[in-house]
């Protein structure tokens, strides 16, 4: 919704309908699509006694118990080492790619590598390097390099051109360093810090497929019903991420990275014959390997009917439902985190809850919910909506704090509905569309937990050593994600959606 005029501020009048048409229509269609998807979704509660399991989890949360200190320190060290090394490689590669981001082929390459989830990359590299440090490093570095290249490239493009023109006689590299890079540096550092937090969460999730991070011990404790130990590890994870502002210092980063390289060298026992066979034979469709081109059509048709189409459909269904409930929860949670609506104590409590929800990865939340309700789309919907709505609600609350209100502005629900929401609705949609791509990626990967999205069929293909099927399904997942990214950018452009707020 567009910003209300200065005359209407404080009057609690509904803005004119003409300014709302396109945004209302977009919101309505997304809600309608989510409603249709709900009719197709499997949201059955399969667990025979979820309340008993919930009670056991609650008891574990209030009586945390640590695993052995050796396991805890090992998990922490590996988690930090994977994140630091992966981000170091991603920053260097992302920066180099950002310098060439104006070229379409660079943008396409970056879009492709970031469209593949880090867990899918890990499953690929496990076949090549086993459960080694190199697998974890590459699984983090590749998709994050694509993401950082995009953001860095856009930051460089958005810097004012006047300073660069003023240095026409300077060398190109010098001009870039003293203009574009210098102007973009604060935002670049801020975003890199945020991505490191994301890398910590991703590294934890790599433990769920066997790498020795905190997630490995957390998955073991949850699977065996040791909820007190799981709670202890959960609190360590929350403390690790929440305390970043104190221990993540620029001056200490070289020291951290050096220690990470010593503790966990990025090595692997590489069998070059196996590696060559994987990329030159194993991922090639079986009919083509057998020089049987006539059977390629039936092979592809079978894969489409049995795995590709059901996987794509369920991924789309899950992501659209999760997107809708993300929007709904974000709009409901935002007022409880904004000083325009609540007192300081309520705001602090709300901030704490949102911090927990956005700190815990969707995969972990879905895993816990799956233990309660069984393998349906319901755990995934709840996990995706909780995590992403917490991120959006926190940002919307920050936007609302910059708004100026008249002394006679209305209060309560009217203030929210007619004063604040119309002025931040464009920003809300912008954030929602940014998260759409993330939700799509996560919807695919949650199939590893038993939900019939693309991740379910990809994981099954790896377990059956059908790497050709896995490669094609991963390619489909990447293309689906790239299509959603293009659609989201198109909608943002056509609706003139921005992330700056009218503070008048």
Q: Where do the PLM segments sit?
A:
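Cytoplasmic-entry segments and transmembrane alpha-helices of multi-pass inner-membrane transporters
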Residues: 93-124, 151-155, 332-368, 394, ...
